[in-house]
């Protein structure tokens, strides 16, 4: 019985250490180079026809589910020229998302380097979207 208690305590402790909060993950993997937009704020402005919503996940992820109105941008196969065809103005309001907000920051940085000026990263990505 004593051994069983130690095993349970050991696995319980290692599991809790392995779990990180979303904030910890984003602080660890992101540079915070792109401002975030909350899921709540996006929900308020989502129907604005001037907003461009880009899904930076892989094609299979996009095909399974995506936020209504989002355009597929991809990550590994991201093509700036292809995406630029759908964004006429460098000042357009662009919101990029992925699963959590890590890949989307990379894509947003690429867009920023290409001269786009009004980009936000969906905090928590599609997993935080309700």
What are these model-derived regions, one by one?
Residues 38, 74, 123:
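Short loop/edge segments at beta-strand edges and connector loops
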Residues 6-52, 59-63:
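Flexible, polar/low-complexity N-terminal or interdomain linker segments that lie immediately upstream
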Residues 78-130:
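Catalytic cysteine-centered active loop of the rhodanese-like fold, especially the PTP/DSP P-loop
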Residues 52-81:
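A glycine-rich, hydrophobic loop/mini-helix early in the fold
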Residues 1-5:
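Positively charged n-region of N-terminal signal peptides that target proteins for export
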Residues 45-53, 68-69, 92-94, 117-118:
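Short active-site oxyanion
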